[in-house]
Amino acid sequence: MSQVTKYNGISKVYFKKILFEIIKIGSLKNINKNILDYGCGEKYLEKMLEKKILNYDIDYRYNEIKDIYKTNFDIVIFNHVLMYLKKDEIKNIFKRFYKKNKNCEFIIGIGKQNFLSIILKNITFNFRAHEGTISSYNDQLQIIKKNMEILKYKKNIFFMTDIFYVKFK
């Protein structure tokens, strides 16, 4: 079982800002749709929304659904998750969601590993942050642009994260 990321201090401020922007870009407070938070961690998004969404994480303690591909979701959120997957795994995940619901929309937060993220890791003593990164920012963006239509985006949240609201082409 893998550990979910724990946020405190300045990293919690950063993370909550990202979630606020995800909620805003998807108008998530004002809709009644079936939402999946893929990589939910400690369910911060659900707490901020103050409404029930389905949560799924590599840490099974947070899972509320066994097979995410058997449920028809309207919106799936990947926040700082795709970077831990190989490019083929990312493509396969999108293919499986496409087979289930061609109208599914996604809100994807992509972290940038840059000078500021290195400073933040050192300030917060979170030296292992992004340790398991497999797919780069450019790898993730390339897959999104090839398979998705970008509906909205918010760039440079604290210069370290871009958020894309997309749907299948």
Give residue ranges: language-model regions.
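Short alpha-helix
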Residues: 131-147
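Conserved S-adenosyl-L-methionine
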Residues: 149-159
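A short glycine-rich, Lys/Arg-flanked "PGG" loop and its adjoining helix->strand segment in the class I
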Residues: 91-104
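Short, glycine-/aromatic-enriched active-site segment of Class I SAM-dependent methyltransferases
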Residues: 113-131
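Conserved beta-strand signature within the Rossmann-like core of class I S-adenosyl-L-methionine
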Residues: 103-111
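A conserved beta-strand element that flanks and buttresses the S-adenosyl-L-methionine
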Residues: 77
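Conserved N-terminal segment of class I S-adenosyl-L-methionine
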Residues: 1-68, 94
